[in-house]
Design a protein with these regions (language model features):
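Elongated scaffolding segments in large macromolecular assemblies
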Residues: 2, 7-64, 209-313, 322
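Alpha-helical solenoid scaffolds in large eukaryotic transport, assembly, and signaling factors
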Residues: 20-190
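Core helices of alpha-solenoid repeat scaffolds
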Residues: 31, 35-42, 83-95, 139-150, ...
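Helix-loop junctions that connect tandem helical modules in alpha-solenoid scaffolds
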Residues: 44-63, 93-116, 152-164, 200-210, ...
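Generic preference for well-ordered alpha-helical elements
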Residues: 66, 116, 143, 168, ...
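Alpha-solenoid helical repeat scaffolds
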Residues: 68, 118, 138, 145, ...
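Flexible helix-coil junctions and inter-repeat linker/turn elements that act as hinges
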Residues: 71-86, 99-107, 122-141, 155-159, ...
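Long all-alpha helical scaffold domains
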Residues: 166, 172, 180-181, 200-208, ...
Length: 348
């Protein structure tokens, strides 16, 4: 059996020396080596990235530091749990710096700012290595962040392709965390407008071909879980989603819709999901009817959605009879597995 690949040697360690072998290799597999040096480099990077009117050579050095940070942290891609004891020290400094930047200049900050792009790039790298769900826990989650982050995201959206793709992705994840904070979004016209603005800008990223679509699905899934938003906004989303499934020529948009529903069905309150289950199943039906076999990513998420819907219908105690809809979703899963087998056979 082939041996598992070991992390690349750390700077300052001669691969040919005695210290680079044996127990040192085992240590690299069981701890975050050179953490102090890494955190020192991160501090230098943040300071350089946020320098006002930095000359070209400082900006070049900032990029070099970012590339080195990314190279060093990518070593732990396959054993990312080793980073867990240090995640707060890793994620909080760039996240807090981003928070300060956005809070003080959300209406004036250039969406193409090199500082904004650099900070979001580093946060994306951490989410890639350790997973967005875990890294998101260390993003600021204060009510005061909602409006500044939303304003900046709207300006980023208006700027289009000139903005680094990591920027909208991180802002969408950040807003998704803020949406989980227990504060009221009902009662005032202003609050209702904020909720509508969040939904509108997040929906606009669902047809994206990149990570922004993933961030948008997470944000919408969490927004629709809020009691004051779910009652009217989620049914309207389902109606819109069925129309887009039938009419949209974009497989990316279909994927984004299914991703959003997967988030909602997995994490929403059981009674709420069951209340809208038939409508969600209608979207799934349209996904099968209009997209089956045309896109692997669409197939993946419709299969995931069918599985989650079936789980939501399973009773907590042994029933006298099983809901017929469970059989329908299980049949959909079996068909998807059969379809996957055909794909594997023909591509072998």
């Amino acid at each position: 059996m082939a041996a598992a690949a070991l992390p690349a040697p750390q700077p300052g360690l001669d691969p040919g020396s005695d210290e680079a072998g044996g127990d040192a290799e085992l240590l690299e597999l069981t701890s975050f080596a050179h953490v102090d040096e890494y955190l020192a480099l991160q501090r230098e990077f943040i300071q350089a990235a946020t320098s006002v009117d930095a000359p070209d050579h400082i900006q070049a050095e900032t990029q070099q530091k970012l590339q080195q940070l990314e190279k060093d942290i990518n070593v732990y891609q396959e054993q990312s749990y080793l980073l867990d004891p240090y995640l707060e020290a890793l994620v909080s400094p760039p996240a807090r710096t981003l928070q300060q930047l956005v809070r003080t200049a959300s209406t004036e900050l250039d969406p193409t700012s090199s500082a904004l792009a650099a900070l979001c790039r580093l946060l994306y790298v951490y989410s890639k290595v350790r997973g967005y769900k875990i890294v998101s826990r260390f993003l600021p989650h204060e009510v005061g962040d909602l409006l500044p982050a939303l304003v900046l995201l709207e300006r980023v959206r208006q700027s289009g392709s000139r903005v680094s793709w990591e920027v909208p992705y991180v802002l969408l994840l950040w807003l998704g965390i803020v949406c989980l904070v227990p504060f009221s979004l009902k009662g005032g016209t202003h609050d209702e407008q904020v909720a509508s603005r969040i939904e509108l800008v997040a929906r606009s990223y669902l047809p994206s071909s990149g990570k922004a679509r993933d961030g948008a699905a997470v944000l919408l899934g969490r927004l629709y879980r809020r009691e004051e938003v779910a009652g009217s906004a989620f049914p309207a989303f389902l109606t819109w989603a069925r129309g887009r499934m039938r009419e949209s020529g974009s497989q990316f948009e279909r994927t984004g819709i299914l991703q959003t529903l997967c988030e909602m069905v997995k994490n929403g309150e059981t009674h709420f999901v069951q209340q809208h289950l038939d409508s969600v199943a209608g979207v799934l039906h349209d996904a099968v009817q209009f997209a089956q076999g045309r896109n692997t990513l669409v197939d993946r998420f419709r299969t995931k959605l069918a599985g989650r819907l079936a789980l939501r219908l399973l009773p907590t105690q042994a029933p006298a009879a099983v809901d017929d809809r469970v059989d329908a979703f299980v049949e959909e899963l079996l068909q998807a597995l059969q379809h996957q087998v055909r794909i594997d056979i023909t591509s072998a």
